[in-house]
Amino acid sequence: MAVYDLEEQEKIEALRSWWKENSKFVLLTLAACLIAIAAVNGWRWYQRTQAAEAAEIFKTISSLSGKENLSKIQETSQRLRADYAATAYAARAALISAEESFKAGDLARARSELQWVVDESREPGLVDIARLRLAGVALDEKKPEEALQLLNAPHDAAFDGLYLELKGDVLVAQGKLNEARDAYNEALKKTEGAYRAIIEAKRDAVGE
C-alpha cells in the first residue's frame, strides 16, 4: 500500500511539475481557441445581419423603375456595393441599375455597374449575365472588338444562345454578314421555344 501511495505521489508531483512548466502555453492555446470560436460566431452573426439589412435596402431598388426613379436606383445600388458588397443583393442591384441606366442612355453608368458585377460577384451566373450586357453596351458605344472579346469569354453553356445571338449582332455591325449568319445559325442550335423566331428573323435579314 505504501508503494502504491508513493507511486501516486510521484505521478501527482510529475503532473504538478508539468503544469508549472506548460500552464502558460495551455492557457494561451485555450484562449486562442475561444477567441477563434467567438470570431467565427461573430462573423456568422455579422453576415446574417448584413444580409438582412441588404435585403431591406434591395426591396427599395427592386420596386423602382423608369427614368424618374433613376437617381434613386443608382444611389441605392451604390450604397449596396459600398456597404454590402459581400451580400448577394449588391450584384443584383447593380444589374437593375445597369439596365435602368442603359434605358435612360447613361451608358457610362451602365458600364460601371456591369463591370463591378464581372469583377466582384461570386456568382458565375450573374457574371455571365453582366458580361453579356456589357458586350451590348460596348456595341452601342461602337466598340465591336471589345464586344466580341467579352462574348468570346468562357461562360456557362446555358447562355450560349444569347452570346451567339449578340455575336451575330456585332458581326452585322462590322459588315461581316457571312460570319453573322453563321453565328445566328449556331445560336438557333442552342435556343428553344418562341425566341427562336427572333433569331431566325435576324438571320433571314442578313440574306443568303
Annotate each language-model stretch with its function.
Residues 1-32:
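N-terminal positive-inside, membrane-proximal cytosolic segments immediately preceding the first
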Residues 26-29, 50, 68, 101, ...:
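Short Lys/Arg-rich amphipathic alpha-helical segments
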Residues 37-56:
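Transmembrane signal-anchor/signal-peptide helices with a preference for the extracytoplasmic
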Residues 56-92:
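Short extracytoplasmic
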Residues 84, 89, 99-208:
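Soluble extracytoplasmic domains of inner/organellar membrane proteins
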Residues 95-96:
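Early exported N-terminus immediately downstream of N-terminal targeting peptides
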